[in-house]
Amino acid sequence: MSKVLVLKSSILAGYSQSNQLSDYLVEQWREKHSADEITVRDLAANPIPVLDGELVGALRPSDAPLTPRQQEALALSDELIAELKAHDVIVIAAPMYNFNISTQLKNYFDLVARAGVTFRYTENGPEGLVTGKKAIVITSRGGIHKDGPTDLVTPYLSTFLGFIGITDVKFVFAEGIAYGPEMAAKAQSDAKAAIDSIVAA
């Protein structure tokens, strides 16, 4: 049995293409792998606090007493990291906003990236500590950006996930959604076909 963590990060709720596609993946996964356990965390419905000067102090080893706000941030960071490490497959629904990931997803990453916990520095360079995972990224875009200089989402997510130890990453693209109903429908259809292939593997 595998455990699957689904991270939604769109601000558009049910209207979101990435949310719809991640819901489709969950449906297909349950159909093909009924014994697996699936956890869904919606980072827009339950937002993560923005990292600031006060909160970053909670995430660094220190003997200094923590403020109540820092204590809350540290407890949430511990919870998010424990959840991440407890799952085998990480599904990230990542819409492109202004060429990059959403603020909601970035805030999550900022609380998950912790030296000595999810990565460490060695004499040979940084080493990721969140290993043995597979990641599936579902990324939706209004325009066409894949393999082009305006796609900052793919390299960023590949770099971040690899940095914390997740190197088995598959991407599903839904592009051209803003180009009209026909293009949007094709984007959904192509993305669902890619999801079907991944789930069946």
From Swiss-Prot:
First-tier enzyme category under EC: oxidoreductase
Keywords: Flavoprotein, FMN, NAD, Oxidoreductase
Subunit structure: Homodimer.
Recorded catalytic activity of this chain's protein: 2 a quinone + NADH + H(+) = 2 a 1,4-benzosemiquinone + NAD(+); N,N-dimethyl-1,4-phenylenediamine + anthranilate + 2 NAD(+) = 2-(4-dimethylaminophenyl)diazenylbenzoate + 2 NADH + 2 H(+)
Gene: azoR
Family: Belongs to the azoreductase type 1 family.
Protein's organism: Shigella dysenteriae serotype 1 (strain Sd197)
Function comment: Quinone reductase that provides resistance to thiol-specific stress caused by electrophilic quinones. Also exhibits azoreductase activity. Catalyzes the reductive cleavage of the azo bond in aromatic azo compounds to the corresponding amines.
Cofactor or coenzyme needed: FMN
Protein's name in the database: FMN-dependent NADH:quinone oxidoreductase
Pfam families linked: Flavodoxin_2 (PF02525)
SUPFAM superfamilies in the cross-refs: Flavoproteins
Enzyme Commission number(s): 1.6.5.-, 1.7.1.17
Lineage: Bacteria, Pseudomonadati, Pseudomonadota, Gammaproteobacteria, Enterobacterales
InterPro entries: Flavodoxin_fold (IPR003680), Flavoprotein-like_sf (IPR029039), FMN-dep_NADH:Q_OxRdtase_AzoR1 (IPR050104), NADH:quinone_OxRdtase_FMN_depd (IPR023048)
